[in-house]
Structure formats: C-alpha cells, structure tokens
Amino acid sequence: DKIVIVTHVSPDGDALGSSLGLLHFLETQEKNVHIIVPNAFPDFLRWMPGAKDIIRYDKYSEFADELIAEADVICCLDFNALSRIDAMAKPVAASAGRKVLIDHHLNPEDFCRVTISHPEISSTSELIFRLICRMGNFEDITREGAECLYTGMMTDTGGFTYNSNSREIYFIISELLSKGIDKDEIYRKVFNTYSEDRLRLMG
C-alpha cells in the first residue's frame, strides 16, 4: 500500500508527533509512507526522528501532487476541515485514495471515508497511540515512534499543564517510557530552545 499522511498548515508538535508516530508504526508493517505538510514547521521540532524526510508542499508541490494522486490511503491527521491544509486541499479532495481522518478537534467536516474523531482526547498523538494499541500492535511501536507520540502529547498540553487530568494520559506515558524514551531530554529539546518559534509557542 502507498500511504500519504497529511496534516495542517504551520504544523505544531501534535501535528508532527502524530504524523511521525503513525509513519514509524506503518513502516514496521512494511508500508510505503510519506508525510506531506503545507509549509514550514518550527526548528525546535526538527530533531524528531523522521522529520528530515517530511515533504513541504510549498516547496515540492509537483512531487507531492504525484504522491497524493497515487496514494491508496490518505491519512488526514490533526485537522477537521480541508481548508486547514491550504493549497493541498484540492489534490487531496481529487485523489481516489481512501481517506481516513484521525483528529481531536470539534465538529469535523465530512470529507473522508472514515472519520475517527475524539474531542475528549487531549491530542491526536494520544489518539494514534490508542488506535495502534486497539489494533493489538503495541509491540510494533518503536522508540522513535514513541518519542514522536510523546512530543505531540506533551506540546498539546503545554507540558501536561492543561487538558491533561485524565489518568489514561499518565498510563500512556509509562507505556511510552517502556519503549526507552527520555522524556526529560525531549522536554529540553522542545521547551529550552529559545528560537523565535519557541517564544511564540510560549505565548
């Protein structure tokens, strides 16, 4: 299967964490996977495993259009409306590939064959973890994938300072730690990098 993962304009930690976490899992299933994003993402997320292979639509639109057109499956992560992927909306809508929405925002639009929407869950990265486990594939989550999923969960809750009171989140963190992630190092890479992007995220 040829699988394309797309996420929203100006991708944040959860957009990239969920996309890369899903990519690392799908690669263990021997799938051909590409991530396409509409535009640039912050420098403080470039360390994430697999980030260097992400395709920017604003730079490589012709190549991206080919991948989207030829995809068997298009996974739409961390957005609830086609307008959120900017210029990519038209080729994604036109593709014959089966579209799957996986998101945690309210009121998803009806543009995918399958919609997995859980606004009660704090991040799309957490949702990806839950889906992989629901399929019985926890063993196939790699350390690299776990690092990406943890980053998404951490950034979408402000370092677990809001929207993070469910016990399940901390159970999931313990499961990700069992994969060998260093959560303190991940925190330093994301929150102690004082770039312009970082300062903007801090408010």
Question: PLM features: residue spans?
Answer:
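Short glycine/serine/threonine-rich phosphate/pyrophosphate-binding segments
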Residues: 13-19, 82-86
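Active-site cofactor/cluster-binding pocket
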Residues: 55-114
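Acidic active-site catalytic centers that drive phospho-/nucleotidyl reactions
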Residues: 12-14, 78, 103, 156
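Short, glycine- and charge-enriched coil/turn segments that flank and shape catalytic ligand pockets
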Residues: 30-32, 65-67, 95, 135-140
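Glycine-rich, phosphate-binding/catalytic loops in enzymes
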Residues: 22-23, 91-94, 117-118, 171
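Short alpha-helices
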Residues: 102-172
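Short acidic, glycine/serine/threonine-rich loops at helix termini
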Residues: 17, 46-49, 88, 111-114, ...
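Hydrophobic helix-and-loop "lid/oligomerization" segment in the mid-to-C-terminal part
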Residues: 1-9, 17-49, 53-56, 62-66, ...
